[in-house]
């Protein structure tokens, strides 16, 4: 990253989560059709079964965060996924699919655009880092944790204990890392917890994560325009603790925005959302 680039914004969307799930459902449909033709070997059959289990779990979790009118079954998503493949393979953006709108940059040398340069859907025009509301929703009794003169092990344990007090639903958690009375990093997290019958809680959706450097300046902001949904239903503590561990180890050196962004996105397998310049750092 260039020296003058000190702030990173990652905008996810539009429709990225649904598009990914639907596309993988289309892949599953292809696997199943190949299996019906008795053309799938044993390793392929194993991949089919694992993909199906993963998708069923992810769809179940994702549907919880969607209004009832937008919830879809695996079979419905398979049909959409197959259409998406046709759009990608045959370069036909006219086959409009809700939640999946390929962005085509026309080649100026050919107005008919037979060969298109396909890229990710661009961020919302005019939405700069400081234009986006920092705390999009009111949260009752937000939790703030100040970790003073603690080693990382004790700090992570305190975060785990505090997060465990959160009620089901949306939450806001502010973590302030204070070492030798020097406020080295602050992390603000917005998300949604689900409470399970066995008493455990899981972080179902991460809406927003901001990281600030020693001077309080915003150095990285993860904006989930189409909420980043945690795929598994493991306890959300693991994600929060891992993020915190990556962000701050008590070093006095400035926090690098690119490193912070990589740390956030790697928790969700979303490193590909970084620009090439950020990824190289």
Curated annotation (Swiss-Prot):
<dbReference type="InterPro" id="IPR009068">
    <property type="entry name" value="uS15_NS1_RNA-bd_sf"/>
</dbReference>
<keyword id="KW-1114">Inhibition of host interferon signaling pathway by virus</keyword>
<keyword id="KW-1035">Host cytoplasm</keyword>
<comment type="function">
    <text>Binds and inhibits the conjugation of the ubiquitin-like G1P2/ISG15 protein to its target proteins. Since G1P2/ISG15 is an early antiviral protein, NS1 may inhibit the host antiviral response. Prevents EIF2AK2/PKR activation, either by binding double strand RNA or by interacting directly with EIF2AK2/PKR. Also binds poly(A) and U6 snRNA.</text>
</comment>
<dbReference type="GO" id="GO:0039579">
    <property type="term" value="P:symbiont-mediated suppression of host ISG15-protein conjugation"/>
</dbReference>
<protein>
    <recommendedName>
        <fullName>Non-structural protein 1</fullName>
    </recommendedName>
</protein>
<feature type="region of interest" description="RNA-binding and homodimerization">
    <location>
        <begin position="1"/>
        <end position="93"/>
    </location>
</feature>
<comment type="subunit">
    <text>Homodimer. Interacts with and inhibits human G1P2 conjugation by UBE1L.</text>
</comment>
<dbReference type="GO" id="GO:0039580">
    <property type="term" value="P:symbiont-mediated suppression of host PKR/eIFalpha signaling"/>
</dbReference>
<keyword id="KW-1102">Inhibition of host PKR by virus</keyword>
<keyword id="KW-0694">RNA-binding</keyword>
<keyword id="KW-1048">Host nucleus</keyword>
<dbReference type="Pfam" id="PF02942">
    <property type="entry name" value="Flu_B_NS1"/>
</dbReference>
<dbReference type="GO" id="GO:0003723">
    <property type="term" value="F:RNA binding"/>
</dbReference>
<keyword id="KW-0899">Viral immunoevasion</keyword>
<keyword id="KW-0922">Interferon antiviral system evasion</keyword>
<keyword id="KW-0945">Host-virus interaction</keyword>
<feature type="short sequence motif" description="Nuclear localization signal">
    <location>
        <begin position="50"/>
        <end position="55"/>
    </location>
</feature>
<keyword id="KW-1095">Inhibition of host ISG15 by virus</keyword>
<dbReference type="GO" id="GO:0042025">
    <property type="term" value="C:host cell nucleus"/>
</dbReference>
<comment type="similarity">
    <text>Belongs to the influenza B viruses NS1 family.</text>
</comment>
<dbReference type="GO" id="GO:0030430">
    <property type="term" value="C:host cell cytoplasm"/>
</dbReference>
<dbReference type="InterPro" id="IPR004208">
    <property type="entry name" value="NS1"/>
</dbReference>
<dbReference type="GO" id="GO:0039502">
    <property type="term" value="P:symbiont-mediated suppression of host type I interferon-mediated signaling pathway"/>
</dbReference>
<dbReference type="GO" id="GO:0030291">
    <property type="term" value="F:protein serine/threonine kinase inhibitor activity"/>
</dbReference>
<feature type="region of interest" description="G1P2-binding">
    <location>
        <begin position="1"/>
        <end position="103"/>
    </location>
</feature>
<keyword id="KW-1090">Inhibition of host innate immune response by virus</keyword>
